[in-house]
Amino acid sequence: MMSKLQIIQSKGQYINGEWIKGNGLILESTNPASGTLLWQGNNATDEEIANACYVAHRALKSWANTSFEERARYTKAFVEQVEKNREQLARLISLETGKPLWESQTEVSSVIGKVNLSIQAYQERTWPKQTETAEANACLRFKPHGIVVVLGAFNFPAHLSNGHIVPALLAGNTVLYKPSEHTPAVAELIIQCWHDSGLPPGVINCLQGNANCGNTLLSQDIQGVYFTGSYATGLRIHQQFCNRPEVILALEMGGNNPLVIDEVKDIDAAVYHTILSTMITAGQRCTCARRIIIPDSQTGDLFLERFAKACKLMRIGSFDSQPEPFIGPVISHVQALKHLHAQKQLIEMGGEIILPMSLLLEYTGLVSPGIIDMTRAKNPPDEEIFAPFAQIYRYNHFDEAIQLANQTRYGLSAGLLSDNKDHYQQFYQNIRAGLINWNRPTTGAASSLPFGGVGCSGNHRPSAYFAADYCAYPVASMEQPLLTTPVQRLPGLVLE
């Protein structure tokens, strides 16, 4: 078991089945709950990135021609390695992201469960099909795109990347993986699990680095990019490929998600699901509700009072503190300051603070939950604040609640807490989002379903169960084993 004070020295870039010590610019990650150095390594150089792309191309033909059953066997061997390293991986996720250990353990379980679900999804959505016609066999098969880049996210450093990598490999692609620069240590352990699975050299390659490394990687000869992150970064990726439409992009870009509270009987249940919607993972889930839309009534007042009290009593701290915390820090001290500045701007726009978000410890990402009433604010920004911070909006009638919920250019998740089934039907019919939940947190999602949004939340390439769709392309064939002249020939042709 690693010590909190131990600095992990990087193994290097993972290229062609080997760890290669590089000499690029220094890259470091810190424990956001303490501000202490955790991992030290190097950014990938341009030469290392080009070499990784070369070996991925070289490995592609053999890997694509490997049977699906054999490719699936490697992914199951990967799961065995993750199982062996379950405790170490969970602890490392907590050290590098600040998540409570209970949440990191849940993430590791998601990594493990993803493989069988991805195999099932591939067989259901991209399995070969054949239909006999009068003239030939009509065949549908699927081929891999080629070399795909996976750009990892820090909030689920093992699970979200894995959600792209596993279906990409199952489909026969080779992978160039650039983790988030905030979570390189977790990425190294995940890649070591792939290495120990016996995966052939060149099939997966890992390149650590900052945004500049990512830009260099995207300029290579690649056929796909799978990204999870902010709208601003996703937009830059989209613009970078405006002259390369042949490269498939799967972009998941977050949201300014609404949660509507109806005139409910169980206020405590509404508070509980709202906390899970807004504050879990320190508000760093793309599905977190940012806007809480409550009735301007006694019910709304009571809900807000209890919600604020529960947030004030919430345990916040390092993952190894006792009693165990509900949330840890945001990913860095820099991000914490950015979120506090966003709160200040909302106050200047007319927002009324109910519970201030505050920095709890200098040089860390530890912030307390914040709540602000934006009902009377002028022109509130339609932006995602990736923090434990909720904006309150009040409504007088349910139609107004739906109107407020839809006042966003995003469209990832939306939720309704209500005892009224008719209201849910109205909500479902009128809300524009890729995930719509009823009496469940907005953060509740299942890997057995698609995961993706509309508007500025994505580009219509949902992941999770539908990831198989963007990892392979369909090939339609009309086939017959013997070359013959048809009995019924077209008019105007004479064959001697």
Swiss-Prot record:
<dbReference type="InterPro" id="IPR015590">
    <property type="entry name" value="Aldehyde_DH_dom"/>
</dbReference>
<dbReference type="InterPro" id="IPR029510">
    <property type="entry name" value="Ald_DH_CS_GLU"/>
</dbReference>
<comment type="similarity">
    <text>Belongs to the aldehyde dehydrogenase family. AstD subfamily.</text>
</comment>
<dbReference type="InterPro" id="IPR050485">
    <property type="entry name" value="Proline_metab_enzyme"/>
</dbReference>
<keyword id="KW-0056">Arginine metabolism</keyword>
<comment type="pathway">
    <text>Amino-acid degradation; L-arginine degradation via AST pathway; L-glutamate and succinate from L-arginine: step 4/5.</text>
</comment>
<dbReference type="GO" id="GO:0043824">
    <property type="term" value="F:succinylglutamate-semialdehyde dehydrogenase activity"/>
</dbReference>
<protein>
    <recommendedName>
        <fullName>N-succinylglutamate 5-semialdehyde dehydrogenase</fullName>
        <ecNumber>1.2.1.71</ecNumber>
    </recommendedName>
</protein>
<keyword id="KW-0560">Oxidoreductase</keyword>
<dbReference type="InterPro" id="IPR016162">
    <property type="entry name" value="Ald_DH_N"/>
</dbReference>
<dbReference type="GO" id="GO:0019544">
    <property type="term" value="P:arginine catabolic process to glutamate"/>
</dbReference>
<feature type="active site">
    <location>
        <position position="252"/>
    </location>
</feature>
<feature type="binding site">
    <location>
        <begin position="229"/>
        <end position="234"/>
    </location>
    <ligand>
        <name>NAD(+)</name>
    </ligand>
</feature>
<dbReference type="InterPro" id="IPR017649">
    <property type="entry name" value="SuccinylGlu_semiald_DH_AstD"/>
</dbReference>
<dbReference type="GO" id="GO:0003842">
    <property type="term" value="F:1-pyrroline-5-carboxylate dehydrogenase activity"/>
</dbReference>
<feature type="active site">
    <location>
        <position position="286"/>
    </location>
</feature>
<dbReference type="GO" id="GO:0009898">
    <property type="term" value="C:cytoplasmic side of plasma membrane"/>
</dbReference>
<keyword id="KW-0520">NAD</keyword>
<dbReference type="InterPro" id="IPR016163">
    <property type="entry name" value="Ald_DH_C"/>
</dbReference>
<dbReference type="GO" id="GO:0019545">
    <property type="term" value="P:arginine catabolic process to succinate"/>
</dbReference>
<dbReference type="InterPro" id="IPR016161">
    <property type="entry name" value="Ald_DH/histidinol_DH"/>
</dbReference>
<comment type="function">
    <text>Catalyzes the NAD-dependent reduction of succinylglutamate semialdehyde into succinylglutamate.</text>
</comment>
<dbReference type="Pfam" id="PF00171">
    <property type="entry name" value="Aldedh"/>
</dbReference>
<dbReference type="GO" id="GO:0010133">
    <property type="term" value="P:proline catabolic process to glutamate"/>
</dbReference>
